[in-house]
Amino acid sequence: MEKIIIYGGTGYIGKFMVRASLSFSHPTFIYARPLTPDSTPSSVQLREEFRSMGVTIIEGEMEEHEKMVSVLRQVDVVISALSVPMYPSQLLIIDAIKAAGNIKRFLPSEFGSEEDRIKPLPPFESVLEKKRIIRRAIEAAELPYTYVSANCFGAYFVNYLLHPSPHPNRDDDIVIYGTGETKFVLNYEEDIAKYTIKVACDPRCCNRIVIYRPPKNIISQNELISLWEAKSGLSFKKVHMPDEQLVRLSQELPQPQNIPVSILHSIFVKGDLMSYEMRKDDIEASNLYPELEFTSIDGLLDLFISGRAPPPTLAEFE
């Protein structure tokens, strides 16, 4: 059973990765910054919870090269779930992997758009370029890799688009970006994590791009809103934000506030997630493991109705 270390294992998607790794009985490690007096109680509690579940937490800085090399020599697979501001520090992970010499697979922090095949508005493009730099560095170092394009984090975007609550009791406005007809892919974070742990240890996925595009999870904003209205019993006022307004906001808002609107434009107006055909050497994740299945969008919304969905959060861009 492969030993897996997760960088960013206490972050939003990283927490799901850690739990998924444990669920498949992998010896699981986290490399994390040391706690400080300013650390939140929830951060302390999460580390205590993970330790009680058997996770080995190594505290250290990204610049501690020798420490990272020593830790990496104890594991087989490296998964980075670092947030956008930490993307460049993955070059330090690559250096440590090269020095360790034993890592069977590296999965960089991706899990969103397939960056080599789209060109969004400049603020989001600058984020994707940071990811491309990491990809090219991995390839130049000839490290065994898997690139995961997981598309939209399902609970994150349901929270963002529909702002639901466990027991909705009031009507609210819902913003529709563009016409609302553009198709995108919505995958529950728990499933993204489970498939990621599986592909990280699957020889078929070595040096390949794995795309999480289950046909049943391709949907438009209008379809998602209709499904939520039927399920919640509520009727929402729809407010359209046209293409031109998103473009203008991406130009006028300061950094990093211009990044989220550029992402919204990419996904919900341009349709970048569905803008390319799968190549013959791509792997579509939902075909890989008969014992696993992606949660349907209907099932995802049920989590919100029952109050079992992850709470709202916002991505960090600086």
UniProtKB/Swiss-Prot annotation:
Binding site for NADP(+): 10-13, 32-43, 84-86, 109-111, 131, 151-153
A Pfam family per the record: NmrA
Expression across tissues: Mostly expressed in petals, and, to a lower extent, in sepals, stamens and pistils.
Enzyme class: oxidoreductase
Entry EC no(s): 1.1.1.319
Effect of substituting P88S: Confers eugenol synthase activity. High eugenol synthase activity
Gene Ontology BP, a term: phenylpropanoid biosynthetic process
Site (Required for activity): I263
Catalytic activity from the UniProt record: (E)-isoeugenol + acetate + NADP(+) = (E)-coniferyl acetate + NADPH
Function: Catalyzes the synthesis of the phenylpropene isoeugenol from coniferyl acetate. Phenylpropenes are the primary constituents of various essential plant oils. They are produced as antimicrobial and antianimal compounds, or as floral attractants of pollinators. Isoeugenol is a characteristic aromatic constituent of spices and a floral volatile compound.
Name recorded for this polypeptide: Isoeugenol synthase 1
Species for this entry: Clarkia breweri
Gene designation: IGS1
